[in-house]
Design a protein with these regions (language model features):
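Catalytic machinery of carbohydrate-active enzymes
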Residues: 1-354
Length: 354
């Protein structure tokens, strides 16, 4: 265990620069840090694309975000992006952090570069026999003696700070204003009170994770017939022909049309905060492996998830009841409607009395 300062609360910054699911899987680390060091000043450094995952998080004192050039808003130059980044890191250096934690599996040179720009007293991270690893002065040699979840893997970085054991659940907090707007949309539907509200998230980045539209329609019909359920439909907005950011507008329209007479609200989410708020109102979630699945887990939602060519041991929903369906082919298209319906029934059994 590394020595701790005794004259003032610790100042710790957790760095995670990659995808939405990765960031959600870092949140148990933040919760454990707060439990072990309740008086510490705990911050996070993320990219602007993922920022909403951390908004309102009660365990964090400060959240800092930098913009990647590919995520810059319209009218913002690349030079402007880098100038803003330089100013941000000048500010972070003035904070004089005790520890910067590079939250990610393996030795991560790019994240290490960010940590060094902050100039903390100590850098905690995984090390491997690679150039630059010597800059991590509180190193944890990276080995993977057995398969483990992403949450468990990176949680090992807290051992130098005296934190070990089973990681807690992730905590994602929906923005109160976004939730009010989502509730207002639902209120306009004039659905009978007491219906089970189920989220259907139909988009997936990997082709092997995409469940066919007609099966979402058939599954929703069956779940409605069995319990009178209503649905919120989520997808990645946009045209499927867009080469840079293909979306699933066409699929969403097909599903809404196919479910004529069944209560379903199409809920396009152009911002991450909208997705978080919408999912927060649902009783359960049906989706493929991906960022939305991890957000749902962070919101504490029971999940029926479809896994294609993904490592279920590494990426299953963390800390919530779930049923994971994966075929030997590692193709989601091989999962039948019957299997999905049976999986959802098992999910409800898991949540009874919980």
């Amino acid at each position: 265990m590394v020595p701790m300062r005794s004259d003032a609360p610790l100042k710790i910054i957790v760095i995670r620069r990659d995808n939405i699911g990765d960031l959600v899987c870092t949140l148990p680390m933040v919760t454990a840090l707060r439990a072990r060091y309740p008086d510490a000043e705990i911050s996070a450094l993320v990219n602007s694309y993922n920022l909403d995952v951390l908004k309102g998080n009660p365990e964090l004192d400060h959240v800092y975000a930098y913009t990647k050039a590919k995520h810059r808003p319209p009218g913002k130059s690349v030079a402007g992006v880098y100038w803003d980044r330089l100013r941000l890191f000048a500010r972070l250096r003035r904070e004089r952090f005790d520890y910067a934690i590079i939250a990610g599996a393996h030795f991560l040179p790019r994240a290490l570069r960010l940590a060094r720009m902050i100039k903390p007293k100590h850098i905690i991270g995984f090390t491997e026999p690679k150039p630059g690893a010597h800059h991590i002065d509180v190193g944890v040699p990276y080995t993977l003696p057995q398969p483990m979840h992403e949450v468990e893997d990176i949680f090992r970085l807290l051992a130098p700070l005296g934190i070990e054991g089973t990681p807690p659940a992730a905590t994602v907090v929906a923005d109160a204003k976004e939730v009010v707007e989502a509730r207002a949309l639902l209120a306009k539907q004039d659905w009978p009170a007491g219906r089970r509200l189920i989220a259907l998230h139909i988009s997936a980045r990997k082709v092997s994770q995409r469940w066919p539209v007609e099966r979402f329609v058939a599954l929703a019909r069956r779940l409605h017939q069995e319990s009178g359920a209503a649905f919120l439909l989520f997808w990645s907005p946009g045209d499927s022909s867009n080469p840079l950011h293909p979306g699933d507008d066409d699929k969403a329209r097909e599903i809404v049309t196919g479910l004529g007479g069944i209560p379903i609200l199409a809920y396009p989410t152009h911002r991450l905060g909208e997705l978080i708020a919408g999912l927060s109102l649902c009783e359960a979630v049906v989706c493929s492996d991906g960022g939305a699945m991890h957000i749902a887990a962070g919101l504490g939602k029971p999940i029926l998830c479809f896994f294609g060519n993904s490592d279920r041991k590494r990426w299953h929903p963390w800390g919530v009841p779930h049923v994971l369906l994966q075929k030997e082919s590692r193709e989601v298209t091989d999962i039948s409607v019957d299997e999905a319906a049976e999986g959802f029934a098992r999910l409800l059994e898991k949540t009874k009395g919980g």
